[in-house]
């Protein structure tokens, strides 16, 4: 600063003038003050100029970005428009008068070729199906060598085959009673006497004639189940802790018990103490499916056929604990030990009677 003052000091006046040294200092101070004011004004002017330049640069960047986005959208639109034009020209080209890159004559020829091709294919398939159906009888299965031995089912329905109920609480067993009553409606004595015939027991009921001829069915009356018929005890023993469970074999067309011996039913404790079940009564008393209900001729001709039943009356079962029960079919040709299928020749369920 002192150097600037020295360089800008006012010129020396000749001796002829009457100025004093104090006047020279005052002049130098005035120069210094003027320079400071100019510097301050320059600083004040420079700051707004820089801010304005930054704002202008930001605005220019934003404008450039907008222009880039608009150009990108325009490029995208133009690309889509070009694709649509290509598709439109492929579907119909008015200049060449072509559709799908083919003339009308070539398209007509192509349609004719495809028509005859698919018509021939449909005719071959129809002929094969017709020939196949000629060899299949709707009344008798063609292939029976792979049919498994009969499986079994029980009534009433129970969730997971677990019969859990409390004797003193009717709400816990009433649904079993309703299920049994509904299932046995088709076995009512009056209905069986009206629809089916009274067949002699102990022998097959073989009916000759055409396979499409209606077949007769033997009576299986509800009264055959005695204490488990619901006629004498409407609760089927559930109110006294002596439940009845009905078992039937699945129907198989043409099935006959081998050697002329009826298939029997046997129940026991599956695992655990065998004394958990001390007494079981079977109805009919033979605990078997009589031969007169076989063979079965199929639902198309054996319309009124009624599957025979065996009722198990569990009269003395340990209470207040779960008892696993297994009921098996016994007879020649019957398989009842398949591990992977618990319903082939046997059924397993649980009794849990609370008091």
Swiss-Prot record:
Residues 1-108 are nuclear. Residues 130-355 are perinuclear space. Pfam families: Na_K-ATPase. It is found in: Nucleus inner membrane. Expressed in skeletal muscle (at protein level). Expressed during postnatal development in skeletal muscle and heart. Gene3D superfamilies: Na, k-atpase alpha subunit (2.60.40.1660). Its main location: nucleus. Keywords: Membrane, Nucleus, Signal-anchor, Transcription, Transcription regulation, Transmembrane, Transmembrane helix. Disulfide bonds: none annotated. InterPro entries: Na/K_ATPase_sub_beta, Na/K_ATPase_sub_beta_sf. The chain crosses the membrane at residues 109-129. Residues 35-76 are annotated as: Disordered. It comes from the Eukaryota. It is a single-pass type II membrane protein. One of its GO terms (cellular component) is nuclear envelope. GO terms for biological process: potassium ion transport; regulation of DNA-templated transcription; sodium ion transport. Residues 49-68 have a biased composition (Acidic residues). Associates with a SMAD7-transcriptional complex. Interacts with SNW1 and TOR1AIP1. Does not associate with known Na,K-ATPase alpha-subunits. Belongs to the X(+)/potassium ATPases subunit beta family. May act as a transcriptional coregulator during muscle development through its interaction with SNW1. Has lost its ancestral function as a Na,K-ATPase beta-subunit. This is Protein ATP1B4. The gene is ATP1B4.
